[in-house]
Regions:
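Small/polar/charged residue-enriched interaction surfaces, especially the RNA/DNA-contacting tracks
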Residues: 1-402
Length: 402
């Protein structure tokens, strides 16, 4: 007999939107256990790991069901339960088409905020070296952001960092029976597992600097204290107050501009698409992953202004509103590519980034009055600093390392 156990911690690098199917608080409430604690179900973890291997290996390790009979999985996965403090926040979203909201496109959902930690366990039963290889490869991809949890995974949600990965194995039945994987004392002699980056990882990292304010709105119901006006809406932020730009905002802006450069067909191939009202729809998942960006180094500013009638140049009745926005911050945006792309597609992506740097592409709302502008301070492709080539618009040089 052979039993191998892995213990790990998933620390959220971006919000986790894992729906429970319940819509008591929002359109999609986060999954909670009986104590009200968020967790990642074992089925989700097993599904993500299984998806990372080829079909033959999947059948060998994860079991099969055929014609009413089958084999049990050799990989036993346990729920990863949130430890310590956690914060569940509500995200408001709206489906846009060329900056215009679609009818019935407003929705909200709950998400576990960035920084929460989840502890989980995996047991391998007589898997041999193949089992260790599969777990190591899967956790490398999870740690690199190629495998994520929940929904909206290509748009910045469900990214985790793998921390404290440990392995312990048993070939003696008595030693195995004495082992309790939930007891910290039993892991004292466990082996620490180091993870490396996948060799096939293709990514672009942008270091960005704000050129003005940002307006990705979260509407507020706070009441004024009599001295300071409570904002009608404010920049989207974490519970800790850190302002964020969700991957959905980046993806929408990038896709719209990419479509202008490369056309709808290539945009569907890179950003994915869904065929609605079609019986045999050929839907495609996005081949580009956007990160969620956290802003820092700037400051909040509360602005009160009027809406002006374009004909009379006078103020509109009831159109005084207050906004809390964020200025002068810096952030990073990471783009990961899961498929090889043609040079035409790569050039179009680089052209979109150039537009962002030159102020021709903005993110969020109120873009017509100067919000959402950024400059590219640094550009790295696959870990190599290519800022100078980008400044010279030497796309041929950039493609050499992509």
């Amino acid at each position: 007999m052979e039993r191998v156990y892995y213990r790990y911690i998933f620390r959220l690098k971006s919000p986790l939107a894992l729906g429970s199917g319940i819509s008591d608080n929002t359109d999609s409430d986060v999954l909670l256990d009986s104590r009200g604690v968020p967790y990642i179900p074992a089925t989700s973890i097993a599904g993500v790991i299984r998806h990372s291997v080829d079909e033959d290996t999947a059948r060998e390790l994860f079991g099969t069901i055929q014609n009413g009979s089958g084999e049990m999985s050799k990989v036993l996965t346990y729920d990863a339960v949130c430890t310590g403090e956690n914060a569940v926040s509500v995200r408001d979203s709206v489906r846009l088409n060329n900056k215009v909201a679609d009818d019935t496109g407003k929705f909200d959902f709950e998400a576990v905020e960035t920084g929460a930690e989840f502890r989980g366990y995996i047991e391998l039963a007589d898997c041999g070296a193949d089992g260790d290889s599969v777990i190591n490869e899967a956790f490398q991809k999870i740690n690199a952001g190629l495998l994520r949890f929940g929904h909206k995974t290509t748009r910045g949600y469900g990214t985790v960092a793998v921390e404290g990965l440990q392995r312990i194995g048993f070939s003696d039945a008595d030693d195995w029976l004495d082992f309790d994987m939930f007891d910290d004392e039993c892991w004292k002699n466990a082996q620490a597992v180091e993870l490396t980056k996948p060799s096939d990882l293709t990514g672009i990292t942008l270091s960005l600097k704000q050129r003005g304010g940002i307006s990705i709105r979260r509407y507020s119901t706070d009441v004024s204290d009599g001295e300071n006006a409570a904002p009608d809406y404010e920049q989207l932020s974490l519970r800790s107050g850190v302002p964020v730009i969700p991957g959905t905002s980046w993806a929408g802006a990038f896709r719209a501009r990419f479509c202008e450069f490369a056309g709808e067909e290539k945009a569907d191939g890179l950003f994915g698409h869904i065929e609605e009202n079609v019986k045999q729809a050929r839907n495609k998942k996005s081949a580009i992953y956007f990160s969620e960006s956290m802003l820092d180094g700037g400051y909040y500013k509360t602005v009160t202004r009027n809406s002006i009638d374009r004909f009379t140049s006078g103020t509109n009745d009831g159109a005084l509103y207050t906004e809390k926005t964020y200025y002068g911050g810096s952030t990073e945006l990471e783009l990961l590519f899961t498929e090889k792309q043609s040079d035409d597609v790569k050039r179009a992506v680089l052209a979109v980034i150039a537009d962002l740097d030159n102020g021709f592409l903005s993110v969020g709302g109120l873009t017509s009055v100067g919000r959402g502008l950024f400059s590219v301070e640094k550009l790295c492709i696959n870990g190599q600093d290519m800022t100078e080539s980008f400044r010279n618009y030497d796309f041929d040089k950039l493609l050499e390392v992509w």
